[in-house]
């Protein structure tokens, strides 16, 4: 799996409100917003469209973990 650029634009499609979406200038901000949802650690609450890629909850969680790890190491 290729590495994602966290500074690319992204759109979050919320599952709990069909048709609702939120645009972000940075993929990292989109991931953080999704993970702020109380049930995001257990359930699929959204998916993200970034450039030509569809990102499901499992990958959103992985990106968040890597982002947290990178911030602690820097």
Task: Show where each model-derived region lies.
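Low-complexity, intrinsically disordered short peptide segments enriched in small/polar/basic residues
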Residues: 9, 28-31, 57-60
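Short, mixed-charge low-complexity intrinsically disordered segments
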Residues: 40-74
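Short aromatic-glycine-(Arg/Gly/Cys) micro-motifs in beta-strand/loop hairpins
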Residues: 1-19, 48-51, 62-63
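Residue-level signal for functionally critical sites in structured catalytic/ligand-binding pockets
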Residues: 12, 36-37, 45
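A short, exposed loop/beta-hairpin motif centered on an aromatic-Gly-Thr core
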Residues: 18-26
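A short, charged, amphipathic alpha-helix used as a generic interaction element across diverse proteins
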Residues: 25-40
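A broad, structure-centric signal for solvent-exposed, well-ordered loop/edge residues
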Residues: 19, 31-34, 55
């Amino acid at each position: 799996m290729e590495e994602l650029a966290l500074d690319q634009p992204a759109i979050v499609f919320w599952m709990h409100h069909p048709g609702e979406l939120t645009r972000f200038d940075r993929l990292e901000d989109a991931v953080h917003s999704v993970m702020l949802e109380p049930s995001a650690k257990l359930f699929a609450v959204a998916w993200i469209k970034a450039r030509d890629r569809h990102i499901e909850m499992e990958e959103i969680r992985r990106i968040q973990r890597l982002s947290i790890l990178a911030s602690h190491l820097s």
